[in-house]
Design a protein with these regions (language model features):
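Short coil/turn segments at beta-strand junctions that form active-site/ligand-binding loops
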Residues: 15-16, 53-56, 74-75, 106, ...
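Hydrophobic alpha-helical membrane-insertion segments
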Residues: 31-32, 71, 90, 136
Length: 189
């Protein structure tokens, strides 16, 4: 269990690992223009290779066609992105849906778009498809001196990020203290 998480979110890690990904854009017509160089089927295989039945998969928005996610047996959480039109279309495919950013721990904010914060918290997000900005990205850790982690699929080579490993390897070690904010009331399901 990831004890760093606020109590309501600890259940995500009770039986397995917590994985995150963003911007899968399954079946989106503009997918090739965003630097995607693998098929949806190949991308799904990479997700399923790590994320299993007892795990939790947190998708940080811009899902595309959610039917692709039926093949993933994990508990699924969505933080909606700018291409995700309504929560209603995703309810059959996700166990929890958040319409905006959510603090899952004192120093960890999940969002679709990056939220500039200085060093108050660590922002895990997607949205930015420019991989050249994120050369120091590491699957099991974090980039030294960075307070954000961009998990847009094409930026992270279509791999899911293991949150527990990231925390263990110092994900939030260079973040100053933060007071609990109340924007995590965006839950819709």
């Amino acid at each position: 269990m990831i004890k760093t998480l606020y109590k309501p979110f600890q259940r995500w890690s009770e039986k397995g690992s917590v994985y995150l990904i963003s911007d899968t854009h399954f079946d989106d017509s503009d997918r090739p223009f965003m630097g995607y160089n693998i098929s949806e089927k190949e991308q799904l295989y990479l997700i399923k290779e790590n994320c299993h039945k007892n795990d939790t998969l947190i998708h940080l928005g811009d899902v595309g066609n959610p039917k692709w996610l039926e093949q993933i047996k994990a508990y699924k959480v969505l933080v909606m992105g700018n291409h995700d039109e309504t929560a209603t279309q995703f309810k059959p495919y996700f166990d929890e849906i958040y319409t905006g950013p959510v603090f899952i721990a004192e120093k960890i904010l999940l969002s679709h778009e990056p939220i500039i914060n200085g060093s108050a918290w660590y922002n895990i997000h997607g949205h930015d498809h420019d991989a050249s900005k994120y050369k120091e990205w590491k699957v099991d850790g974090f980039a030294e001196g960075w307070n954000d982690l961009n998990l847009a699929s094409n930026v992270v080579d279509y791999k899911v990020y293991n949150l527990g490993k990231g925390i263990k390897h110092g994900l939030i070690s260079n973040v100053d203290g933060v007071h609990r904010l109340t924007i995590d009331k965006a839950r819709t399901k």
